[in-house]
Amino acid sequence: MKKMIFLIAALFMLAAFAPTQAQTFYDMELGGSVQCTHQFRDRGFVNVGTDLRATLPVSEWSRLRALVGVNGFVPNGFDRYGYGMVGITAEALPFYVFGDFGLSCNPSGSHTIGLAFDAGVGLAFAITDRWRLYSELAIDRINSGKLWQSTSSVKAGAMYRL
């Protein structure tokens, strides 16, 4: 299963370097999503959160976009986690793959600073010349002090091209 995921991700990365004829996503985009997150160690918990992001094209001749954003969610009703992220998105529209990393913080618990990693696949549909809707499936690894947490997320959101 892991080999299949890596193979699909590699194909999207190769498609990202193909020259584009019409850069419909050449401008900066701003957007956000609502997410449902499940912690692997706490079976049965389904958590909610938000994701705010901006993307910029890396070059005129590739489908790579730089990703900067903030992700936050409530994993168990008591603690809140958030992390800033910097990453890359490879688009072969309507599909794309992404990966990012950043610093995490637990503002309601131990106030620890840790690391966060996020990777996944997404599907985006243009609804106007400036708006597009997207949905993502992601795997997150978040360090909250001494403990690494693994979560899976399903996100649905919208992006606006400036």
Describe the predicted segments one by one.
Residues 1-27:
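Cleavable N-terminal export/targeting peptides
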Residues 21-73, 155-161:
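Short glycine/proline- and aromatic-enriched beta-strand/turn motifs that initiate or cap beta-hairpins
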Residues 26-28, 42-50, 78-84, 105, ...:
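Residues that define the transmembrane beta-barrel architecture of outer-membrane proteins
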Residues 28-34, 66-70, 86, 97-101, ...:
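Membrane-embedded beta-strand positions of outer-membrane beta-barrel proteins
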Residues 34-40, 56, 70-76, 90-94, ...:
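Transmembrane beta-strands of outer-membrane beta-barrel pores
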Residues 58-66, 94-97, 125-133:
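Repeated loop/turn-to-beta-strand initiation elements of outer-membrane beta-barrel proteins
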Residues 102-134:
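A mid-sequence interfacial segment
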Residues 125, 149-162:
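Outer-membrane beta-barrel "beta-signal"
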